[in-house]
Design a protein with these regions (language model features):
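C-terminal "cap" of GNAT-fold acetyltransferases
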Residues: 89, 123-136, 140-145, 149-175
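Extreme N-terminal starter segment of soluble prokaryotic enzymes
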Residues: 1-3
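Short polybasic/polar patches that bind polyanions
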Residues: 101, 118, 140
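Conserved G/P- and acidic residue-centered "switch" motifs that form tight phosphate/ATP-binding loops
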Residues: 11, 104
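Generic detector of contiguous secondary-structure segments
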Residues: 52-60, 122-131
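Acetyl-CoA-dependent GNAT
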Residues: 6-10, 17-30, 34-99, 110-112, ...
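Short coil/turn segments at alpha/beta junctions that flank glycine-rich nucleotide-binding fingerprints
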Residues: 103, 120-123
Length: 175
């Protein structure tokens, strides 16, 4: 059974492991291999420790735990970082270990994230995803509407990201 709960500071190492492992499996063939090999559990742990300790950042983070209380997925976000009206919030990151994908965990994480946005007074959100990432279909299945695309550089390669948006996140919390 998978449990979804708010993240705590002590979750930083578990979140970091899911973050790094998910990048390595999900983005193989998309992001340069050297970049993926250089990802560090310790650097990601430090990053997540800082995020989870910084209350002023208003970062919303939830984790998915298995029966052994190991973190197998997480979602994080907050206010839209690039101010893309009419979107108030941004889902910055959602990752689930490959062996746990396809079990509805992603939908549950998005739902709890959207519920927290609504409690915080934010009714709309967007997210960015690599154009080559097959998970785009997941966001489309949740009703995400294509907004725009942008190019950026990572590990010496130019990649394309696409933004999906929800003008009313309440659709994500309905049964």
């Amino acid at each position: 059974m998978i449990t979804i709960r708010a993240a705590r500071v002590e979750d930083a190492p578990g979140i970091a492991k899911v973050h790094v492992d998910s990048w390595r499996t999900s983005y193989a063939g998309i992001v340069p291999a050297a970049f993926l090999e250089n990802l560090s559990y310790q650097r990601r742990t430090n990053l997540w420790d800082d995020i989870l300790r910084d209350a002023e950042r208003e970062h919303i983070v939830y984790v998915a735990e298995n029966e052994e209380q190991e973190i197998v997925g997480f979602v994080g976000g907050g206010r839209d970082r690039e101010h893309n009206p009419p979107y108030e919030a941004e889902l910055y990151t959602i990752y689930i270990l490959q062996e746990y994908q396809g079990q509805g965990i992603g939908r549950r994480l998005v739902r709890v994230f959207a519920e927290q946005l609504l409690r915080s007074g934010m009714r709309s959100m967007l997210l960015w995803v690599f154009a080559q990432n097959p998970s785009r279909r997941f966001y489309e299945s949740l009703g995400g509407r294509y907004i725009k695309s942008a190019q950026f550089e990572i590990g010496g390669a130019t990649l394309e990201e696409v933004a999906y948006g929800w003008e009313d996140v309440s659709v994500l919390v309905q049964d």
